[in-house]
Amino acid sequence: METILQHVPVGQKVGIAFSGGLDTSAALRWMKNKGALPYAYTANLGQPDEEDYDAIPRKALEYGAEKARLIDCRPQLANEGIAAIQAGAFHISTGGITYFNTTPLGRAVTGTMLVAAMKEDDVHIWGDGSTFKGNDIERFYRYGLLTNPALKIYKPWLDQTFIDELGGRAEMSAFMTKEGFGYKMSAEKAYSTDSNMLGATHEAKDLEHLNSGIRIVNPIMGVAFWKPEVEVKAEEVSITFDEGRPVAVNGREIADPVEMFLELNRIGGRHGLGMSDQIENRIIEAKSRGIYEAPGMALLHIAYERLVTGIHNEDTIEQYRINGLRLGRLLYQGRWFDPQAIMLRETAQRWVARAVTGTVTLELRRGNDYSILNTESPNLTYAPERLSMEKVEDAPFSPADRIGQLTMRNLDLMDTRDKLAIYSKAGLLSLGTSSALPQLGGDKK
């Protein structure tokens, strides 16, 4: 059974993820002219660079859509963002600076909620603007078919007729003008931007070249902190969690997760917190480069991990981080709702996040420069008196206890020395004076 349609489905309803930009506008009008019945669906993801959401469906109707709907995806996106924080679902980082998978989270929400809306309108063919070289074509494919197993995929950008007739932005603009809409192309930027409430992605064009970097980017969620003329004042902020969920900022309770992210974005954005420059592996294993913004996610991540390290033991923290790396890859690959991802996510939410209650106070400066000023929690297992260098009453252990503990280490030390001797005899340990490995003789003493 054919899932991907390579030609316009004439006379059939076709749902298109409609952004209002030139690409989707031209595609919608072109499909209409070819005999399809286009239905337009726009996701409100709280994009910081979108000024008027209500105008987008009106545009779609003007261009020939049979029906146009605006779907509010913000509450779901906010909750998925919090779930990613709770599970540490981030696998891409450079020099300790994290990419918070904000685009994959947005695709998980868009791909499921738009297709669900299409089902309500008896629309079972879906198209979007993703290209064959990127990650989104696979993410949307997976999420769409998970939501509607009967779904067919039609993407104008995979239709050779569309490519031949409207292969570039100049051709699309001329087509829309010819159709009587006078569409004017926006000024070309040196890169492309995709955003949602959780973060922004800047990539392609000039940013494909590694000798071009963050200095050409105009942030849309914060300030260009690298510019000396941009004033950034130090600021204290406190974030409170209750059983793994953020509930207050600077002592003010915020019950709505959407408002929580908007407030954290405002605070973090004033400093340029959460911006990063990453080289990553796309799903098809080719490398790409992106510059990212995520001020609110960065604030939550810093505060949440501070509480995790103060509350949980070393083995739990290690497993949380291992699972988070794996879950981050699954999220990136469009598998956020696959069973293996749900298992990892719910494990973290149940056994890690549930204990994360407390308040972390930070001082934010420029960019990702910050200090942790205070950590408070009723669940802290950090107890300074246990290891105090001062004399304390009711010490948890004595010098004699430590002597006994160290004596027990002799067992594994003997085993280790025996193994090193075996490696030495096998020639695996060099005996040069500069060797960093233990220098053992060949004979056991």
From Swiss-Prot:
GO terms for biological process: argininosuccinate metabolic process; L-arginine biosynthetic process; urea cycle. The keyword Transcription regulation does not apply. It is found in: Cytoplasm. L-aspartate binds at T131, N135, D136. PROSITE patterns: ARGININOSUCCIN_SYN_1 (PS00564), ARGININOSUCCIN_SYN_2 (PS00565). It catalyses: L-citrulline + L-aspartate + ATP = 2-(N(omega)-L-arginino)succinate + AMP + diphosphate + H(+). Homotetramer. Its EC number is 6.3.4.5. Pathway: Amino-acid biosynthesis; L-arginine biosynthesis; L-arginine from L-ornithine and carbamoyl phosphate: step 2/3. Belongs to the argininosuccinate synthase family. Type 2 subfamily. InterPro entries: Arg_succ_synth_type2_subfam, Arginosuc_syn_C, Arginosuc_syn_N, Arginosuc_synth, Arginosuc_synth_CS, Arginosuc_synth_type_1_subfam, AS_cat/multimer_dom_body, AS_multimer_C_tail. It comes from Ralstonia nicotianae (strain ATCC BAA-1114 / GMI1000) (Ralstonia solanacearum). SUPFAM superfamilies: Adenine nucleotide alpha hydrolases-like (SSF52402), Argininosuccinate synthetase, C-terminal domain (SSF69864). Keywords: Amino-acid biosynthesis, Arginine biosynthesis, ATP-binding, Cytoplasm, Ligase, Nucleotide-binding. This is Argininosuccinate synthase. Pfam families: Arginosuc_syn_C, Arginosuc_synth. It is an enzyme of class 6 (ligase). ATP binds at A17, F18, S19, G20, G21, L22, D23, T24, S25, A43, G129, T131, D136, D194. L-citrulline binds at Y99, N135, R139, S192, T201, E203, E280. It comes from the Bacteria. One of its GO terms (cellular component) is cytoplasm. Its main location: cytoplasm. GO terms for molecular function: argininosuccinate synthase activity; ATP binding; protein homodimerization activity. The gene is argG.
